[in-house]
Regions:
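Flexible loop/turn segments at secondary-structure boundaries
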Residues: 15-17, 93-94, 105-107, 133, ...
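A generic structural motif
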Residues: 8-10, 96-98, 225-232
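Glycine-rich, acidic
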Residues: 26, 31-177, 181
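Single conserved hydrophobic/aromatic residue that forms the stacking wall/gate
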Residues: 1-13
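Short, conserved charged micro-motifs
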Residues: 16-18, 52-55, 104-111, 196-199, ...
Length: 271
């Protein structure tokens, strides 16, 4: 039995893009079952240098690095709640996503907050998570990952193996590759920002000519830099290239950075 969990953004769920696409290509012999669990499943994220200490306080399962490696998942308990714990997160720190039946959410949250008092636990929201994910160049469905861009443009090259056999979209993707791509996803440091950072859809310039647009941005407090992700023309996507970005009608200098400027080697995630 193969079980697949798909956690989509609000936009994709609302527009039913994932839902309709999966149903379109599902086999009709009953070998695959598709069920929307949006209203019955919740997710809480535990992340930070003391995440393992906290999880060991609320669960009888072993969260050691040897027993629970990065990019793996296990069924565990948190208090009285059954949880599908995944050692991944969207903030770039040691941590776990805790997927659970929604009726256990308050119990899990209270358990984590009570056990984490002496560890300095604090709740954080989606805007904080957005800032943290940008420091890692993590891509968001609906912005950096969308039907508007090819997976090559969005920096998903390592997940594409066109020589391993046919798959849905391969023919169209090969034609796209032959034609050439119009965009490349880059991470930018925006210099000398004042009271506003890139929010998204900001035009990107090179010598007064529009060469792309920002898909998102925030101030990165771990890096102490204003960070943005942007789709730009490939000729201007090299590390070190100097560009300009429009924020509320004012131009700011920006530099193309190497991907994942915070903890590039993922040492914290692997800790």
């Amino acid at each position: 039995e193969i079980r697949v969990s798909l956690v989509g953004s609000e936009m994709c769920i609302r527009d039913r893009l994932d839902h309709d696409w999966i149903q379109k290509w599902m086999p009709t012999d009953g070998s695959v079952i598709f069920e929307d669990l949006t209203n019955s499943t919740g997710v809480l994220v535990v992340a930070g240098p003391k995440a393992r200490d906290l999880m060991q306080k609320v669960s009888t399962d072993d969260f050691s690095n040897e027993n629970f490696k990065w990019l793996t998942a296990k069924k565990v308990n948190v208090g009285y709640a059954p949880v599908n714990a995944m050692r991944v997160n969207f903030v770039g720190e040691l941590g776990w996503e805790l997927h659970h039946p929604i009726e256990y959410q308050n119990h899990i949250f209270d358990k984590l907050m009570d056990a984490g008092k002496d560890l300095g636990i604090k709740p954080f929201g989606i805007r904080a998570m957005n800032s943290l994910r940008l420091e890692k160049s993590y891509k968001l469905v609906g912005t950096e990952l969308s039907i508007e861009y090819s997976p090559y443009e969005s920096g998903l090259d390592r997940f594409i193996h066109p020589n391993k056999g046919n798959f849905i979209g391969l023919e169209a993707l090969n034609k796209w590759r032959e034609k050439g791509f119009d965009n490349k996803l880059v991470t930018l440091e925006v210099h000398n920002t004042k009271d506003a950072d890139v929010l998204g859809n900001n035009p990107i310039y090179k010598d007064s000519k529009v060469v792309g647009r920002a898909t998102g941005g925030e101030f990165g407090f771990r890096l102490d830099k204003s960070i943005a992700l942007a789709m730009v023309k490939p000729d201007f996507a090299n590390v070190g290239d100097k560009l300009q970005v429009d924020i509320l009608g004012e131009m700011y200098e920006a530099t193309v950075l190497d991907e994942s400027p915070y903890d590039k080697e993922n040492n914290l995630l692997r800790a």
